[in-house]
Amino acid sequence: MKHIVIIGGGFAGVSTAHRFLKNVGKSTTAPYKVTLVSRDSHFFWNIAAPRGIIPGQIPEEKLFQPIAEGFSQYGPDKFEFVLGTATDLDVGGKTLVVDVDGKATRISYDYLIIGSGSRTKIPGPFKSDGSTDGVKQTIHDFQERVKAAKTIVVVGAGPTGVETAGELAFEYGTSKKIILISGGPTVLENRPASVTKTALKQLETLNVDVRVNTKAKDPVTLPDGKKELTLSGGEKLVVDLYIPTFGVLPNSSFVPSQYLDSNGFVQVDQYFQVKGAEGVFAIGDVSDSEAPQFWFVEKQSVHIAKNLILSLSGKAPTPYKASATGMMGLQIGKNSGTGHFGNFKLPGFLVKTIRKTLFVENLPKTVDGSML
């Protein structure tokens, strides 16, 4: 029996497991079992986190769904869920070491898919940083702090920062001071100029105070609990709530260093196989294949699931063609948004309509595989 072990309870891991389990029986009668290893008991719909930190906007059950229940249709002979954290990988011995309730558990594999995702450089509400209980508590803490704050600064003007500032300003633009700090000359750097211009205008319409070409040093906590930031121009900015949205780090600490690039991302070839590691693959945010964006992860998941089935059927896998086309869509408050496909700017009404709910209705269908 072939044992496929998948690491990660996010989009990459859960989607790949479902796609394989739903389709493998159509192509081969070879015996198999899938084990999904996740440090989170629940799938976190972090796409909606910028709105989720605002009190009363999104109920907890629309942000979190239990993973194991979503795979109940396959039966214990075909699927097993392991709640634990990958701590070590023995490529030669085809063994993964997982910390399960403080105990080192060794799991042998024939194929290993690393879809462990990434985390923010500074822990916050946008990524899980260790457990479902932990990120739930972080969300609740931020909701309380947002409610109490009079002045909020969002540092980092990439998609997460822009969406977060937009959501906050839509709700509180006339009652709280919302500041967005960008280290570059505009927001959404490296996006088409028409998109950055539109985003900036929409933010300003919502009364966001956008500071460009501005760096912020790590904040100092004052005796009253407020945060003091020193900006690159020397200005001291005192705020009630500091929300960092810049930078992600791959969750690859368990992977031997020879398989990582200088930034810690897992190096893969055109088949998503980890370079130099037979039978080991990596997709999504943890790999060096494409930008860490949802639609790229979806494409990668489809491809790796098909290749796994081909391998079990004794057929050669097919190479993946990475996309050279940049794309983005983001909500800026509930009534505006912008985005692009390549150099083509998407109409704001289209982005707003598509992303109106931040896709929370797709959470249950993602976890149980019914939308794949």
UniProtKB/Swiss-Prot annotation:
Cofactor needs:
6-hydroxy-FAD
Q: How is the cofactor bound?
A: Binds 6-hydroxy-FAD non-covalently.
Q: Which UniProt keywords apply?
A: FAD, Flavoprotein, Glycoprotein, Oxidoreductase, Signal
- Stimuli inducing this protein: The cluster is expressed in rice fermentation medium. Three regulators are located in the cluster (ptaR1, ptaR2 and ptaR3), suggesting that the production of pestheic acid is controlled by a complex regulatory mechanism.
Q: Which residues are glycosylated?
A: 251
Source organism superkingdom: Eukaryota
* Pathway this chain belongs to: Secondary metabolite biosynthesis
EC code: 1.-.-.-
Could you state a single Gene Ontology molecular function term?
A: electron-transferring-flavoprotein dehydrogenase activity
- Protein name (Swiss-Prot/TrEMBL): Oxidoreductase ptaL
This chain's source organism reads: Pestalotiopsis fici (strain W106-1 / CGMCC3.15140)
What does UniProt list as this organism's lineage?
A: Eukaryota, Fungi, Dikarya, Ascomycota, Pezizomycotina
Report which gene this protein is encoded by: ptaL
